[in-house]
């Protein structure tokens, strides 16, 4: 049976880092929707948003999500993938959704530590910590609704991977 594990959460929560490590441990393929979008368009998220707006970007993001058809795979999604009810239903129906939860303070710390990795334009134009807190507050219910499992992403990536494995395979962890 084909198994997809969808990593959801805010920008900077570790979806790509944790997803890659989890895929290695499980022997699954790894896919990142932002990377797939870049490969299919030749444009960064910021470039797509500048040309097509957030609505155009979200439509492309949904197309990319539904194109993930490879066998067993861990899929790191964009932070806003859950804004679409269709995307939430698709992920829940096609696999297991893991929400990597972190506080606004932790996300801000990570994004400041690796500014070159943050290629997304601001959603609100506000200072980073304010924007993160506002976006988290607006999306929390949707992340929770999408998720089969919610994990604390403030731990080191290997610890988060271990926690995910314990949630997915509780009998193997005992």
Curated annotation (Swiss-Prot):
Keywords: Amino-acid biosynthesis, Aromatic amino acid biosynthesis, ATP-binding, Cytoplasm, Kinase, Magnesium, Metal-binding, Nucleotide-binding, Transferase. The keyword Kinase applies. Pfam families: SKI. Coiled coil: none annotated. Monomer. Belongs to the shikimate kinase family. AroL subfamily. This is Shikimate kinase 2. It comes from Sodalis glossinidius (strain morsitans).
């Amino acid at each position: 049976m084909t198994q997809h594990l969808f990593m959801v959460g805010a920008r900077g929560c570790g979806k790509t880092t944790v997803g890659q490590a989890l895929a290695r441990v499980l022997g699954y393929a790894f896919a990142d929707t932002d990377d797939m979008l870049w490969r299919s368009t030749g444009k960064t998220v910021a470039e797509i948003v500048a040309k097509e707006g957030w609505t155009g970007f979200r439509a492309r993001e949904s197309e990319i999500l539904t194109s993930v058809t490879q066998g067993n795979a861990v899929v790191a999604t964009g932070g806003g993938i859950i804004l679409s009810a269709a995307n939430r239903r698709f992920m829940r129906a096609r696999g297991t959704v893991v929400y990597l939860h972190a506080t606004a303070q932790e996300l801000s710390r990570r994004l400041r530590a690796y500014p070159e990795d943050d290629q997304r334009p601001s959603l609100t134009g506000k200072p980073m910590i304010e924007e993160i807190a506002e976006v988290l507050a607006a999306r929390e219910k949707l992340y929770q609704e999408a998720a089969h499992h919610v994990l604390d992403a403030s731990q080191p990536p290997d610890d988060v991977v271990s926690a995910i494995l314990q949630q997915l395979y509780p009998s193997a962890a005992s």
